[in-house]
Amino acid sequence: MNQTWRTHLQSKLQQLHERGQYRNLHVTEQAEETWLIRDEKRMLNLASNNYLGLAGDERLKEAAIACTRKYGTGATASRLVVGNYSLYEEVERSICDWKGTEKALVVNSGYTANIGVISSLVSRHDIVFSDKLNHASIVDGIILSGAEHKRYRHNDLDHLEKLLKTASPEQRKLIVTDTVFSMDGDTAYVRELVELKEKYGAILIVDEAHASGIYGSGGAGLSHIEEDLAQKIDIHMGTFSKALGCYGAYLTGDAIYIEYLHNMMRSFIFTTALPPGTLGAVQKAIEIVKEDNERRERLIENGAYFRNHLREAGFDIGNSSTHIVPIVVGSNETALRFSKRLQQVGIAAIAIRPPTVPVNSSRVRFAVTSQHTIADLQWAIHHIIRIGKEEGFFV
């Protein structure tokens, strides 16, 4: 290996070690279950995005197997070549029915959806307004686009409006936000964002990755909680990899947006399509979440139970109002120590550090699912509070 490169890489890795930001891969089995095996230890799974427990659902497995047997293991090409199986059109029609939109586009992941849609729609003459806590894929899409990037303070609509007023009349304007923020568990003010985008002539993209399948009518997303709100949003992005228990993502909105993305979105054009088995599982998952109100209600109840007990105990859980509950502890070292102690007693909860979250806001992030029992959560809460007291986390 080139010695200059070796020295450079070793130096960068050493810096990560010193800052407490070095990351390791850990072998995990049965992550689709309520209890998993991590580094050969059985733990209560409070770390996954399998919010409705569908990743291990037999109906999804059977659908994936049936489509794999019929169509094979791989799509064999990009969708614009010969990889556009009829399954794609079936899933996209289901998404439109679910979301009440004209047209949809299924893509390979939430990351490729966000970097692709943003970098396709705007360029260096345009301006993007993005919540400061938006997902990294949104930030990367803006960087790729070359557009002017204005970050507004988290959920601060007054700051956003102030920034909107600074835009040149000649600039095309895009507002983009997560609806459920993945590291904080709070939610965006979607109606107010719609009002601002209409007032200032912008378009609005919402990332429903952590809301799809959970909130709104039939689990269509947070933007569907209020009647008629969703139709005023230009583009909805959501994923199949969280509450739906599969893999992939979608973009949906007016037909002209999707037609444009077919022709301009590089992360769609230049990649092999999803495997048929994945599409079969996705189609089944959409059918299930549209009808299964019980899972959604149980998830929301479990989230409230877990969240309220931790808040009452004195932990800093920020403004969490969902199934995602962080305990913010500050330093990288403290978050790592807290996570390690939880894993030692059998709780899988992972330390989240910069650059995933802002400096000095490292945390342990808990993700509750519909499959957790109250007994599971009570057991976890007991140990979290005990360890929290020993570590002095209470304010």
Swiss-Prot record:
Pfam families: Aminotran_1_2. Its EC number is 2.3.1.47. Pyridoxal 5'-phosphate binds at G110, Y111, S182, D207, E208, A209, H210, T239, F240, S241, K242. It comes from the Bacteria. Pathway: Cofactor biosynthesis; biotin biosynthesis. It catalyses: 6-carboxyhexanoyl-[ACP] + L-alanine + H(+) = (8S)-8-amino-7-oxononanoate + holo-[ACP] + CO2. InterPro entries: Aminotrans_II_pyridoxalP_BS, Aminotransferase_I/II_large, AON_synthase_class-II, AONS_Archaea/Proteobacteria, PyrdxlP-dep_Trfase, PyrdxlP-dep_Trfase_major, PyrdxlP-dep_Trfase_small. One of its GO terms (molecular function) is 8-amino-7-oxononanoate synthase activity. SUPFAM superfamilies: PLP-dependent transferases. One of its GO terms (biological process) is biotin biosynthetic process. Its cofactor is pyridoxal 5'-phosphate. The modification N6-(pyridoxal phosphate)lysine is found at K242. Substrate binds at R23, H135, T356. Gene3D superfamilies: Aspartate Aminotransferase, domain 1, Type I PLP-dependent aspartate aminotransferase-like (Major domain). Keywords: Biotin biosynthesis, Pyridoxal phosphate, Transferase. Homodimer. Belongs to the class-II pyridoxal-phosphate-dependent aminotransferase family. BioF subfamily. NCBIfam families: bioF. Catalyzes the decarboxylative condensation of pimeloyl-[acyl-carrier protein] and L-alanine to produce 8-amino-7-oxononanoate (AON), [acyl-carrier protein], and carbon dioxide. This is Putative 8-amino-7-oxononanoate synthase. The lineage of its organism: Bacteria, Bacillati, Bacillota, Bacilli, Bacillales.
